[in-house]
């Protein structure tokens, strides 16, 4: 999920003995595997991807259910790390039939212009947003989650999206 190995130059320049350096790296790996084990035990899966900037009405992302079964999407997190939008730009997120289907039933009208923001469909769902949705199996009628830029351009938008789901 988040562990990144220390580069050889940085590893050499770290203080401490070789044993201490290796101990630190192994502890970081253990923390990561413990977190993955907990997620796996709960059956929760997390998909992530990169937000793309674009003009008004462009799609910032489109994620297709990769599973051979239906899934329940319990949370979508939008993490805007660089604001790059014209005042008034919004983001709608929701389930769709294709990679270019507009939907606002998870997040409706998220303001992506005022600040770096981490938002989700629970706290920041807007007027039409729901706490969860069900997607069809891959290739089904409704098997996408899309994020569409609305009203104004967000050409320099930078960030990630995270989709939390459970196979049904």
Feature locations, PLM:
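Surface-exposed, low-hydrophobicity beta-strand/loop segments enriched in small/polar/acidic residues
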Residues: 6-14, 22-168
């Amino acid at each position: 999920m988040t562990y990144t190995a220390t580069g050889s130059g940085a590893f050499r320049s770290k203080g401490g003995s070789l044993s201490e350096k290796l101990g630190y790296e192994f502890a970081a790996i253990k923390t990561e595997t413990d977190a993955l084990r907990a997620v796996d035990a709960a059956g929760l899966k997390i998909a992530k991807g990169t937000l793309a900037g674009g003009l008004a009405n462009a799609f910032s992302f489109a994620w297709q259910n990769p599973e051979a079964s239906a899934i329940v999407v319990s949370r979508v997190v939008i993490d805007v790390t660089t604001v790059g939008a014209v005042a008034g730009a919004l983001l709608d997120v929701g389930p769709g039939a294709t990679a270019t289907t507009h939907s606002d039933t998870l997040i409706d009208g998220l303001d992506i212009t005022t600040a770096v923001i981490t938002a989700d469909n629970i706290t920041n769902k807007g007027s039409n947003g729901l706490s969860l949705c069900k997607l069809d199996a891959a290739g089904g009628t409704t098997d996408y989650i899309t994020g569409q830029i609305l009203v104004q351009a967000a050409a320099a938008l930078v960030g990630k999206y995270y989709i939390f789901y459970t196979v049904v």
